[in-house]
Amino acid sequence: MRDRYLGTTELISVSSDGTKSNSDSGRPTVSADGRYVAFDSNATNLVPGDTRATDVFLRDRLAGTTELVTVDSNEVKGSGSSPSMSNDGRFVAFWSGEQLVNEDTNGRPDMYVRDRLSGTTSLASKSSDGTVGNTLTQPGRLSGNGRFVVWHTGSTNHSPLDDDSLWDVYLHDRQSGTTELISVNTAGEKGNDSSFHPCVSDDGRFVAFFSPATNLSPEDSDDLHDVFVRDRVNSTTTLISKSSLGVKGNDWSRSPSISADGQFVVYLSNSSNLSPEDGDSLSDVYVHDLSNSSTTLASVGVNRTKGDSVSDYTTISGDGLVVAFVSLAQNLIFNDTNGRFDVFTVRNPVVR
């Protein structure tokens, strides 16, 4: 983990006694204050008695401890991956093919949430009446307040609107127990193609996802992948993979990440018409400001020089001030000559 203010780098995938993991670790997620880091790992030496495959762990950087997250409410070990954590580090959502609660009888991977304070594990990928999905659920995300879980699935039994095997985006409210179909248009009609990889604002109001569906917005009539935002309060769905002038992207857009308040969404796009600074089909990082419908190129270097190669894996900080991404570009900073993918951070170009 890199502390950008102190200029220090800390190894996170270690046991409580500081022993380095004996296998691969990845997919980290960090609490708002940086104290807790959850990650998945194939290592068997991070906690005592771990002999299974991939698990989710949590590192407390202040206490210097590492704990296993993928357990049931009786502390019986399971397995899992793809963690997503609440701002305070109390709740950790993860994806698991294990039966960690009695109600999970579908024999398929599902989304779970671990409450580290109460020591309980609950199933999140289920319908409002508690019915588990009838097919595969993909890894999802947890809202910053720990209340909402979003994911995409091919299940047809989570909503009366869903009667096909397309991938659809859902949101589960852990407080009310209700589950809501998200990949719908403003009129409430379900998307006519699959939708993928949602992310959610801290309060659960805004959910961003991408889809090739052509009926989610009147601005979209092609089958290219585009990024949309669902406003659950106003029941609207908005196309955001478009330029500041409202011109829709002419190539694929995907992989959104949303700020805590839902104002900013970053995403990847191969479109060449989203910014006057971009005239090629390389994958670039963009920031869309929902408050004024502006779209700005973010994968730029000194003097706003556009990256000379592909960028990928983008995310935005909770406060919306910093955008991080991976890039093969060698002109984003001085003396980047290794010819490999590197991790970069830039100030949100929309924020002055």
Say what each PLM segment does:
Residues 1-352:
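Conserved "turn/edge" positions that cap or connect secondary-structure elements
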